[in-house]
Amino acid sequence: EDDHHHHHHHHHGVGGGGGGGGGG
């Protein structure tokens, strides 16, 4: 949820991590 400190591959296009998750 909080991509502010959780740089995971969420469904939030907030950074490269988000993009990577979408591709996967």
UniProtKB/Swiss-Prot annotation:
Gly residues: compositionally biased ranges: 14-24
UniProt keyword Secreted, yes or no: yes
Keyword Manganese: no
Biased composition (Basic residues): 1-13
Cell compartments where the protein resides: Secreted
Region span, Disordered: 1-24
Organ and tissue specificity: Expressed by the venom gland.
Function, in words: May serve as a metalloproteinase inhibitor during glandular storage. Their inhibition may be instantly disengaged, by dilution or physiochemical change, when venom is injected into tissue of the victim.
Protein name as annotated: Poly-His-poly-Gly peptide 1
Organism this protein belongs to: Atheris squamigera (Variable bush viper)
Phylogenetic classification of the source organism: Eukaryota, Metazoa, Chordata, Craniata, Vertebrata
